[in-house]
């Protein structure tokens, strides 16, 4: 991995009012994460991803891609500032799902991305694997982040991007994505995490 390059990436789940902070790697020109979504009801989930590239060490930032249960989903870039690139994507889930965000597909990167569990029913959130990051979860979105990233301009830019851009044949429109259950090994990992948390509570 490229040493000396340090990006910053935060992920906000707007409808859940959750902040997943510093999901970027310790170093290296790559960023992404895996988010297991647990839900018993159909719902829309809105993600805003704020990337602060290390402009001192790179010329161009890699775009962020997404897969939802293996299906490619377009992630519109809705705003740029001198320091940040802001992406927004809205998905519709009917049951448990796995969302993967990534700038690279090489396993040398993706294997060290962090992994999270977001239970939208119980409103509980866990870090399943921090990977090579200093990531943490805030069970709220701070007022400062709301003022910076949850603006009308970003909302309007997202609406415009969904209306104007032609559908990419290589990526799935969110309304046509059929969701499936988590892979068995992921379910076991999540179950183990839940049992550990229950034991901690009993202790």
Curated annotation (Swiss-Prot):
Pfam families: Pox_C7_F8A (PF03287). It comes from the Viruses. One of its GO terms (biological process) is viral process. Signal peptide: none annotated. Residues 182-203 are annotated as: Disordered. InterPro entries: Poxvirus_C7/F8A (IPR004967). Belongs to the poxviridae C7 protein family. Plays a role for multiplication of the virus in different cell types. This is Probable host range protein 2-3. It comes from Myxoma virus (strain Lausanne). The lineage of its organism: Viruses, Varidnaviria, Bamfordvirae, Nucleocytoviricota, Pokkesviricetes.
